[in-house]
Amino acid sequence: MSIESIADTIKPKSDQLNADDLIAGPITVTITSGRKVADPKQPLILEINGGHKPWKPCLSMRRIMAAIWGDDGRAWIGGCVTLFCDPTVVFGGKEQGGIRISHISGISKSKTVLLTATRGKRLPFTVNPMPQYDAAQFADNLPKWNAAISAGRFSKDDVVYKAQQSGKLTEEQIQQIGA
C-alpha cells in the first residue's frame, strides 16, 4: 500500500464533510444533488462529487450561495465551489474551525457579501470566481485521460474531479472526457 497520500488516514468519523477533512488542503467540488431536512441547525444536505461525504453548509455559506445562485436550490446543481478549512470560524464562543467557500462558479469577478458574525455585527466575506481549466492543458491531457479511462484505471468521474482541482471544466470539455 502506497503512502503517497495519507489524507484518508486523518479523516474524522462522521456522516458529513467536516473542516478536519480539509486540513490537507482545499477541494474543488461540483454539487450533484441536494435536499432539505427537518434539522433547524443544518437544514440542507448537498451531495458533492469526488467521493466526499455530503456537505451540510452553514448558514453563512448558504447565504453566499443564495446571493450568487439565487434561492432556488435546483439552480445550485452543477455549480462548483472550492471549500477550505478556516481555522478562525467561531462556534459556541470558541474558534473551532469550519468549512468556507473560497471560489464559486457563476461569477466573473470577486463578490463580497456582508454576513452576520454576531448579533449586531456584520463582516464582509469575499468569494472569488472559479478559474477555468486551461484550454491548452486540457487538449494536452485529454488523450492521456481517455486512455486511462479505456484501460480501466480511472472512471470519467475520477478524471473530472481531479481535473477540476486545477480549474472548472466547460460542459463541452466534460463531454469529451471518456468519449
Where are these regions (language model features)?
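OB/S1-fold single-stranded nucleic-acid-binding modules
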Residues: 1-20
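Short, contiguous, well-structured surface segments enriched in hydrophobic/aromatic residues
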Residues: 22-67
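Short connector loops at helix/strand junctions that flank enzyme active sites
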Residues: 26, 41, 76-80, 94-96
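Short, surface-exposed beta-strand/loop "edge" segments at domain boundaries and coil↔beta transitions
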Residues: 52-57, 109-110, 123, 168-172
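Short nucleic-acid-contacting surface segments enriched for D/E, G, S/T with interspersed K/R
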Residues: 67-82
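OB-fold/S1-family single-stranded nucleic acid-binding modules
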Residues: 89-111
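Interfaces that engage single-stranded nucleic acids at replication/repair/recombination sites
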Residues: 116-179
